[in-house]
A protein has these predicted regions:
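Structured beta-strand/loop patches that form or line metal/cofactor-binding pockets in enzymes
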Residues: 1-54, 58, 64, 355
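Extended hydrophobic packing segments that form well-structured cores
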Residues: 10, 376-393
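Conserved, mostly hydrophobic/aromatic
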Residues: 32, 43, 112, 125, ...
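Glycine-rich, aromatic-flanked loop segments that form ligand/cofactor-binding clefts
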Residues: 104-107, 113-156
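Shared catalytic-loop signature of beta/alpha-barrel
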Residues: 250-368, 372
Length: 393
């Protein structure tokens, strides 16, 4: 195997939406195309991009990680079976990188890792979910993945009525579980935000027939302990599907305190970018393996190579892969969920286009989606996204 070329670019995903911590007015994403050549001159091009919430990384890609990948020897990136070995390529990209400090570096590596897995599956002529099931899950792949519609962002002029209409659209698309932002738009005082959020939540619950198990709420890490506990007391009677990222992701001891006082499920992890950070959360965050949800995003956390290490760590600590529901809302994580038996995957039906969402002709029914039989990740079956990725060719 050899790397023929690596091309990169930056795509805008800017929007006027906001969560409790940031707005997305200047958000960007890196896109890459990695062409590899196998035995007999057979070639495949894999594509990658980073999930929303972290910006494009053209500098890190150009200065460190693309050169290392293109300089990798054939032996380094060829597996024992003669196919492309993403783990070997990952090791080449991370050569001479010190441990720790997993912020933006993990995003750059994750973008390339996604493309390498796409290419690896294409060379095998199989969907990525099938390749993963065969290599790492005893050949067992789920027939469908549970997915939920993430939205409910703050937006100028968007009131409760507009929020309910948005959620109604998601239900019409086949989603039975939805997620909305809470914690107030950036700059909103928390005391004001709580009153507004309770009205917003109650309106959505009414739409859902009062069934809290169909609603997730997401703080995006804005709260300290006092605010997290105040919201927890108000949310507890609602029996929500989960209370997401109420605290700074690295504040493990405060997570443990919250878990002592809030019995229903807590979800977190999307902003932890390595197996070691994930392990610290499991060791010190007080999370409960029978109910809490882990949202590590393989596209942001050094890619699937590192995510496989995270899954192994979880098993060693008594956690099932079914407790993992990755952040990101894209086809890469969906393939991983189906192939490795995770608990589901996020979806963005109306935001972060064209990167969010799944293949064009794949319907969602009762918050479940089946996988198309397309080699690789399946970007070619999502026309708007494929058009962006093809600009690199």
């Amino acid at each position: 195997m050899r790397i023929v070329s690596v091309k990169q670019g930056v795509a805008p995903i800017s929007s006027a939406i906001a969560n409790a911590y940031i707005d997305f007015s200047k958000m960007t994403a890196s896109i890459v195309a990695v062409t590899v050549e196998g035995p007999g001159g057979r070639r495949a091009t894999g594509y990658g991009f980073n999930s929303n919430g972290r910006y494009a990384q053209p500098g890190l890609l150009a200065e460190r990680f693309v050169p290392r990948l293109t300089e990798a020897t054939e032996a380094e990136i060829t597996g024992a079976d003669g196919g492309l070995d993403p783990a070997g390529a990952w090791a080449a990209m991370m050569r001479n990188e010190k441990p720790g400090g997993h912020g933006e570096r993990s995003v750059a590596v994750g973008v390339l890792d996604m493309a390498l897995w796409d290419a690896a599956a294409k060379l095998e002529g199989v969907p990525l979910w099938r390749l993963l099931a065969d290599r790492y899950n005893g050949g067992q792949a789920d027939e469908a993945a549970w997915v939920y519609a993430a939205g409910g962002y703050y937006y100028p002029g968007k009131g409760v009525d507009q929020l309910v209409e948005e959620m109604k659209r998601y239900l019409g698309m086949g989603y039975s579980t939805v997620k909305m932002k809470i914690g107030g738009a950036p700059g909103t005082a928390l005391k004001q935000a709580l009153a507004e959020d309770l009205a917003r939540i109650e309106a959505v619950l009414k739409l859902l027939g009062g069934d809290g198990s169909r609603l997730c709420v997401d703080v995006n890490g804005r709260f300290g302990l006092h605010a997290a506990l105040t919201y927890a007391a108000a949310l507890r009677p609602m029996n929500l599907r989960w209370y997401e990222e109420p605290l700074d992701p690295l504040d493990y001891s405060t997570h443990a305190t919250l878990a002592e006082h809030y019995g229903p499920p807590i979800a977190t992890g999307e902003n932890l970018f390595s197996m070691l950070d994930a392990r610290n959360l499991i060791r010190h965050g007080g999370l409960r393996a029978d109910r809490d949800v882990l949202q590590f995003d393989p596209a942001l956390s050094y890619g699937l190579v590192e995510y496989l290490r995270t899954l192994q760590m979880l098993v060693e600590h008594g956690w099932s892969p079914r407790r993992c529901v990755p952040h990101g809302g894209h086809q890469f994580a969906l393939n991983i969920a189906v192939g490795l038996g995770l608990g589901g995957n996020e979806s963005y039906p109306e935001v972060f286009a064209p990167f969010g969402g799944f293949a064009d002709d794949v319907p969602v029914a009762d918050s479940r989606v089946r996988m198309p039989d397309i080699p690789g990740i399946g970007f070619e079956a999502k026309n708007a996204l494929y058009a962006v990725l093809k600009t690199l060719d």
